[in-house]
Design a protein with these regions (language model features):
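Hydrophobic, aromatic-enriched alpha-helical segments typical of multi-pass transmembrane helices
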Residues: 1-227
Length: 227
């Protein structure tokens, strides 16, 4: 890889790293950081918080914007990984690119479903609507199955990254197959369970698990551009 291509690739990962930070901020704005009492579907998402009713509704608007902007920025990093796979004539490079596009495009919907649900619940409670929770959950359940396609794209990406690293197509050292966003997500999940249940632990390791995992991975790619 030439010097110009290396600098260009590093810029892509730098943009993606910033995007992961913005995503972390959006997740924590949306997640209330300290859900004292909550409700919702634990299998699909972090719980909704009753504290949303007492929050500034524009917080959820900002959270939704952060989610959309951050995913678009992180696509730059995914494109950089695609270019590295393409350079090695990886037969799965186009599948990776398509998967990352699905993850980003549908992921923006996923973020907005959460934001709209939180905003709806907040405004209905402010207007004294008795069944605000049920209405909000109806909104969530109507759209979240479409947003779940983001998980399919994400799964395809992490599998391709893992296999390609073992083949020596992403990093020189095959042990770096452990540099995988899914693995870092699992570590964050474990930490969120074993550490004391505080607002900080919940915000960082529960709500921010995916953005932290992607941030670490983009950092590794950033510092290995001159491989």
């Amino acid at each position: 890889m030439g010097k110009y291509e290396s600098v260009k690739e590093k810029r892509l990962y730098l943009i993606a790293m910033i995007g992961a930070i913005v995503c972390f901020i959006g997740d924590n704005l949306l997640g209330a950081f300290t859900p004292a009492s909550d409700f919702g579907n634990k299998l699909l998402c972090v719980n909704f918080s009753y504290e949303w009713a007492d929050s500034n509704p524009y917080r959820f608007v900002v959270a939704g914007i952060c989610g959309v902007v951050s995913l678009l920025m992180m696509f730059a990093g995914f494109y950089g990984i695609y270019m590295r796979l393409k350079e090695k004539n990886n037969r799965n490079s186009k599948i990776f690119l398509c998967s990352s596009f699905v993850f980003v495009s549908v992921g923006t919907l996923y973020h907005n479903v959460f934001a709209v649900t939180a905003y709806t619940y907040n405004r209905l409670r402010a207007d004294g609507i008795a069944n605000a929770k049920e209405i909000s959950l109806d909104v969530f359940n109507t759209f979240i199955l479409v947003g779940a396609l983001a998980a399919v794209g994400y799964a395809c990406m992490v599998i391709i990254m893992f296999i390609s690293t073992i083949r020596g197509e992403l990093f020189k050292n095959r042990w770096m197959c452990m540099v995988n966003p899914f693995i870092f997500m699992v570590i964050c999940i474990v930490l969120s369970k074993v550490l004391p249940q505080t607002a900080f632990v919940n915000g960082v390791f529960n709500l921010g698990q995916q953005s932290i995992g992607l941030f670490i991975v983009f950092c590794f790619f950033y510092f290995t551009c001159n491989r």
